[in-house]
């Protein structure tokens, strides 16, 4: 399964290491010093026991350079989501799964931001609405991107 992690912070990095160690090719969208470090050294994570996990990843600042993915994990802070939603279109194909790994994203988040994900309903637990069955961090695309 081709996996792209959009956001290489603590959550995205942890998921990237776990998925790469499970044998999936992992790419990451990052910027600045984080992008340069990923390109030079791969993804590194210090475990609780002090050991270092290091896995190779493909890293770019431009999602279009990575192509369509089987799974896209969005692991950015909530204020960055509108920009990410517009930029991630080149990663999304008809069978791509989009998984959010962030806090505070209600099911209706994409309904009025414009772009390719306009109207997408996220299956999530939302205290202001009836909970969906998917769980707190699952994203489900209903219809074309």
Question: How would you name each of these model-derived features?
Answer:
Residues 1-48:
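NAD(P)+-binding Rossmann beta1-loop-alpha1 motif at the extreme N-terminus of oxidoreductases
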Residues 9-12, 59-63:
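Short amphipathic alpha-helical segments, especially helix-boundary/capping motifs
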Residues 23-25, 56, 95:
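A generic structural signal for alpha->beta connector loops
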Residues 26, 57-59, 143:
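Generic structural signal for residues in well-ordered beta-strands
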Residues 34, 55-56, 72:
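A generic secondary-structure signal marking the coil-to-beta-strand transition
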Residues 41-61:
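N-terminal short beta-loop-beta anion/metal-coordinating cradle
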Residues 52, 61-145:
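Rossmann-like NAD(P)(H) cofactor-binding subdomain of soluble oxidoreductases
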């Amino acid at each position: 399964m081709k996996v792209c992690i959009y956001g290489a912070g603590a959550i995205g990095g942890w998921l990237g290491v776990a998925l790469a160690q499970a044998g999936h090719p992992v790419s990451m969208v990052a910027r600045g010093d984080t992008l340069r470090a990923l390109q030079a050294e791969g993804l590194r994570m210090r475990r609780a026991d002090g050991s270092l996990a290091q896995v190779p990843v493909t890293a770019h600042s431009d999602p279009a350079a990575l192509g369509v993915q089987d799974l896209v994990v969005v692991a950015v802070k909530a204020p960055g989501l509108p920009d990410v939603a517009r930029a991630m279109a080149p990663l999304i194909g008809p069978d791509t799964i989009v998984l959010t790994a962030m806090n505070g994203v209600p099911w209706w988040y994409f309904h009025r931001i414009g772009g390719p994900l306009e109207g997408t309903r996220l299956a999530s637990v939302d205290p202001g609405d009836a909970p969906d069955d998917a769980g707190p961090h699952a994203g489900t695309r209903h219809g074309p991107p």
